[in-house]
Amino acid sequence: MNFENLLIEIGTEELPPKSLRKLAESFLANFTEELTKAELSFESAVWHAAPRRLAICINQLALAQADKVVEKRGPAVAQAFDADGNPTKAAMGWARGNGITVEQAERLKTDKGEWLLHQARVVGVETKSLIADMAQRSLDKLPIPKPMRWGSNTTQFIRPVHTVTMLLGSEVVDGELLGIKSDRIIRGHRFMGESSFKLDHADNYLVALKEKGKVLADYEARKAIIKTDAEAAAAKIGGVADLEDDLLEEVTSLVEWPVVLTASFEEKFLDVPAEALVYTMKGDQKYFPVFDNAGQLLPNFIFVTNIESKDPQQIIAGNEKVVRPRLADAEFFFETDKKDTLEARLTSLETVVFQKQLGTIKQRVERISAMAGYIATSIDANSEEAARAGLLSKSDLMTNMVMEFTDLQGTMGMHYARLNGETEAVAVALSEQYKPKFSGDTVPTAPISICVALAEKLDTLVGIFGIGQAPKGAADPFALRRAAIGVLRICLENNLPLDLVDLIAKAQELHGENLTNADVAEQVLEFFMARFRAWYQDQGVSVDVILAVLARRPTAPADFESRIKAVAHFRTLEQASALAAANKRVSNILAKVEGELPAAIDDKLLVEAAEKALAEKLAELQPQLAPLFAAANYQEALALLASLRESVDTFFEDVMVMADDEALKNNRLALLSSLREQFLHAADISLLQ
């Protein structure tokens, strides 16, 4: 079989930078899926992407499908011929449909009978005749939320398309994509190199585009150049570039021919909190800030231009001119904001509604303050500082800086709190109240920060559930799932002695008559239980382990964690499988019992040796188990219970639980109930698979 390399490039207008990688990856994934469906073999496949192009390269693609033999079974021989041995209409119709006569058919014998059979040889289709349709289907499945039309064309795509290049080796693949006929034309850089050129062979795509078109189509290579050159540029001025990957990806998606340059700004701007300057440089201008080795912001930034200039200083001066007014705005906001303290801004919070039924932001911070103080008493934190931090937690929302740069909420609160003479613990708590902000973000660890972060999230959760606006489906406008996971993570990662039932009840009490949902406490608790499951599944914990713990509904996150670890460990023990099965059997037996069982086991009614042995073993373990369960040492407790495996197995082998004698039966049920009760102190082991 012959093979050749395939190139497909879609030349467009500037593509959305934040979507570029995803579009290219999806295009490749969709197309390779099409190849697999078409039974076309290939060695490897890669994607390339630049601001004005999406491309995929398939290496060593088979030039045709392999020929194959398809077995087509006909009617059973008994129905294929009549009593005289002549073909029936069914047999002749089947044969005609397969282009043969009945006499030419083979026979297939199986244990269920004998059938007519035709082994049809199917000749593989040439690859080049399939490519265009496969490519179009691949493009149709791209994740494009808002496709657009252009000109008089009815075709839709994420951006207008100007060229389509499909080359199988040196041959142009005939066909049309997105209303554009395939050709070998490749467009180069807008301002450098050849504006367009003809590509002679798919193998030469990257090299020709680089040398003729001045475009680096290899996304990863372009990203690596930017990273390496930016690091070198920062080192040259004695600093370290802040090359956050999201911004690095975005910049990579904005340029075809990256040139890294270094610029500066006036040192006076360094009096403004660094976060505000960094936000301006990264968010608005797509610049990389530079820090010294001590983590202090330097009056420099690194940027990437899309052109090689004979006078780079002119480009540097232009970028410095652009960023200066933005930094000056930040300086003005900061100086203006300093004129009022955070406490003085509390009054203005009365004018801002948090949620119509839940009152103003001022009422919200009063609740957060009380809640934070309440939590502080449970974790040995300073309740006055916690309450103070809660009260000031939203004051920075009324500052010019946060109104202009909303992502700086909390951060600017910290800076203003320090300027106002608040304690460092209070200041840091204002900054950390929204943590964790995203998956993988760190959680607060300082006591006052913990109190405020929990209070802030609980106020939102209980409030929104309390007015009947719980998340439905994928919609979660108040980010309640993130808030709930945040509460759980803060409690778990700090091993806090807090119970969700108490926290929910306190938050409900503080909301008072605002809440109209009578079931708010139970609904919020159930919401937390669902988040427990989601969180632990993300951590790789087996679902059956999670369900075993959830069955007991432990409401203290730290306690939930201890049980999860204990059950996960128990599951690895040799005895686990047998004891899980025994617990399931016991559970099923007890579920069918009507009426109450004896409160205690009557030793006089223990007749069989196996039931005596189990009762003795259980009685021997109970004094050891009680303190372990009291101390939430579930792992050691379950390890002790694992020693019951032999006694339990023997019991079920030798003892008839549902004896005819009512007293014996009830005593045995009481024994099994006592056994199950010990396991249930930790989890429902019967749910383990």
Curated annotation (Swiss-Prot):
Family matches, as NCBIfam families: glyS (TIGR00211)
Biological process annotations from GO: arginyl-tRNA aminoacylation; glycyl-tRNA aminoacylation
Keyword Nucleus: no
UniProt xrefs under Pfam families: DALR_1, tRNA_synt_2f
UniProt subcellular location: Cytoplasm
Family note: Belongs to the class-II aminoacyl-tRNA synthetase family.
UniProt cross-references to Gene3D superfamilies, sorted A to Z: Isoleucyl-tRNA Synthetase, Domain 1 (1.10.730.10)
One of the record's GO cellular component terms: cytosol
A GO term, aspect molecular function: glycine-tRNA ligase activity
Reactions catalysed according to its record: tRNA(Gly) + glycine + ATP = glycyl-tRNA(Gly) + AMP + diphosphate
Oligomer status and interactors: Tetramer of two alpha and two beta subunits.
Keyword annotations of the record: Aminoacyl-tRNA synthetase, ATP-binding, Cytoplasm, Ligase, Nucleotide-binding, Protein biosynthesis
Organism (species): Shewanella pealeana (strain ATCC 700345 / ANG-SQ1)
Enzyme Commission number: 6.1.1.14
Protein's UniProt name: Glycine--tRNA ligase beta subunit
InterPro entries: DALR_anticod-bd, Gly-tRNA-synth_bsu, Gly-tRNA-synth_heterodimer
